[in-house]
UniProtKB/Swiss-Prot annotation:
EC numbers, comma separated: 2.7.2.8
Ranges that cross the membrane: none
InterPro entries noted in UniProt: AceGlu_kinase-like_sf, AcgluKinase_fam, ArgB, Asp/Glu/Uridylate_kinase, Glu/AcGlu_kinase, NAGK-C
GO molecular function: acetylglutamate kinase activity; ATP binding
Pfam families, sorted: AA_kinase
Species name: Pseudomonas paraeruginosa (strain DSM 24068 / PA7)
Residues flagged as site, Transition state stabilizer: K33, K255
Name by which UniProt lists this protein: Acetylglutamate kinase
A biological process term (GO) from this entry: L-arginine biosynthetic process
Compartment annotation: Cytoplasm
Cellular-component GO terms for this entry: cytoplasm
Enzyme class: transferase
Length: 301
């Protein structure tokens, strides 16, 4: 393909802007939570795969954790298994857990691995059960109303929380030039399976690896102020203030708390990225403007 002079000039501009960032992140690990619209559009899926392969090619180490809620819901519906949610978490009985494992560990994980490999990468698919990659325990959910004298414990089945990460396995794969692609299924002390929120798995993996960045792909432009303007950079202190005054609320709270916990746990920065934008991951790390909100321990003005 022959580029016009204007196109060639644009490519040169992009590369010159990216070079300092590439130098800064060579040898660093970036954990990317892949989900939402970025997993649904064929164009965005291909763009994500190219982004990940390019990162690896320039010496950056991407680790991918993926979701798959809509795909799980689709198969449950086809099997006439009803879905129930409590506080945004899917109640996961034994039959639902079987479906979760089939969809996340089979269909979705292998599709992503295949896509990355078709674009020149060496991706390898894993669930948290492989070599006890993601150790977990049952998540306890409680609810209390003013009328109750003590909280009610709600059983939401095989829903778990992360208790440990097999860092040795991930480091071995990364050093072998593989791109790990992780399905968010954890394993308990007795070998039982747990369905875990993909954001939470990504955050814990990033903490365990002492990653440079945790990148959460979403279907929004980033965190916004009360006027609807994207907040491009925030400190953990500023994020807590936005939670306290109600600017950040509802469905974004678990994602933001995951990002905060990762940064407080040693990850250099967490990013809430607009996954609807083509090449969102590269734009966020290799350009001055980015496409989302960066959260770090550093105070920003």
């Amino acid at each position: 393909m022959t580029l016009s002079r204007d196109d060639a000039a644009q490519v040169a501009k992009v590369l010159s802007e990216a070079l300092p960032y590439i130098r800064r992140f060579v040898g660093k690990t970036l954990v990317i939570k892949y989900g939402g619209n970025a997993m649904e559009s064929e164009e965005l899926k291909a763009g994500f795969a190219r982004d990940v392969v390019l990162m690896k090619a320039v010496g950056i180490n991407p680790v991918v954790v993926h979701g798959g809620g809509p795909q799980i819901g689709d198969l449950l519906k086809r099997l006439s298994i009803e879905s129930h949610f409590i506080d945004g978490m899917r109640v996961t009985d034994a039959a639902t857990m079987d479906v979760v494992e089939m969809v996340l560990g089979g269909q979705v994980n292998k599709d992503i691995v295949n896509l990355i490999n078709r674009h020149g990468g060496s991706a390898i698919g894993l669930t948290g059960k492989d070599a006890e990659l993601i150790r977990a325990k049952k998540l306890t959910v409680t609810r209390q109303t003013p009328e109750m004298t003590k909280p009610e414990i709600i059983d939401i089945g095989h829903v778990g929380e992360v208790t440990g990460v097999n860092v040795e396995l991930l480091n071995m794969l990364v050093k072998g030039d593989f791109i790990p692609v992780i399905a968010p299924i954890g394993v308990g002390s007795n070998g039982e399976s747990y369905n875990i929120n993909a954001d939470l798995v990504a955050g814990k993996v990033a903490e365990a690896l002492k990653a440079e960045k945790l990148m959460l792909l979403t279907n929004i432009a980033g965190l916004m102020d009360k006027q609807g303007q994207v907040l491009t950079g925030l400190s953990t202190e500023q994020v807590n203030e936005l939670i306290a005054d109600g600017t950040i609320y509802g469905g974004m709270l678990p994602k933001i708390r995951c990002a905060l916990e990762a940064v407080q746990g040693g990850v250099t920065s967490a990013h809430i990225i607009d996954g609807r934008v083509p090449n969102a991951v590269l734009l966020e790390i290799f350009t001055d403007s980015g496409v989302g909100t960066l959260i770090s321990n550093r105070k920003r003005h």
